[in-house]
């Protein structure tokens, strides 16, 4: 069995990966747009076309990777949400859902639930223990 925090944090890490790939795609889009505008003002040379094609293909490749990651995070969120639903205590479900699905900080959770931050940390630890007990089939 995986460490429950590591397992649950997959959503956070996948989300960060997607965000970094989106930034990469935006930079590639900008490079393609700059190249496109230079095509409109200059005569197109064969090597320029090849360079443009390479950039455009990289842009398409990154876009496809992002789509795959979005599908992955969607499935992961559903699976984790269903596992969290197995917990008996509503506070545990709320804390784990806010922390690992909604990607909230402990401080944001404390404010939202009107609890002291120490209480949130204690409840989070209890929620993780219940998660391990109820969701022993983590993959």
Annotate each predicted stretch with a short phrase:
Residues 1-86, 133-139:
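N-terminal interaction/assembly modules
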Residues 76-79, 90-92, 123:
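N-terminal positioning helix adjacent to the helix-turn-helix/winged-helix DNA-binding module
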Residues 88-102:
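Short amphipathic alpha helix immediately N-terminal
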Residues 106, 128:
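Generic structural marker for isolated residues within well-ordered, non-membrane alpha-helices
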Residues 108-113:
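Short alpha-helical "recognition helix" segments of helix-turn-helix
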Residues 118:
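Key DNA-contact positions within bacterial/archaeal DNA-binding proteins
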Residues 124, 131:
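DNA major-groove recognition helix of helix-turn-helix
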């Amino acid at each position: 069995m995986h460490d429950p925090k590591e397992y649950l944090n997959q959503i956070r890490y996948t989300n960060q990966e997607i965000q970094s790939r989106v930034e990469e795609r935006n930079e590639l889009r900008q490079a393609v747009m700059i190249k496109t505008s230079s095509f409109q003002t200059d005569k197109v040379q064969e090597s320029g076309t090849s360079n443009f094609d390479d950039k455009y293909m990289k842009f398409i490749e990154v876009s496809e990777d992002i789509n795959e990651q979005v599908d992955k995070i969607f499935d992961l969120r559903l699976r984790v949400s269903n596992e969290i639903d197995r917990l008996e205590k509503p506070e545990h479900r709320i804390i784990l859902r806010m922390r690992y699905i909604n990607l909230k900080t402990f401080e944001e959770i404390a404010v939202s639930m009107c609890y002291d931050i120490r209480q949130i940390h204690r409840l989070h630890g209890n929620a993780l223990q219940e998660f391990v007990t109820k969701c022993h089939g983590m993959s």
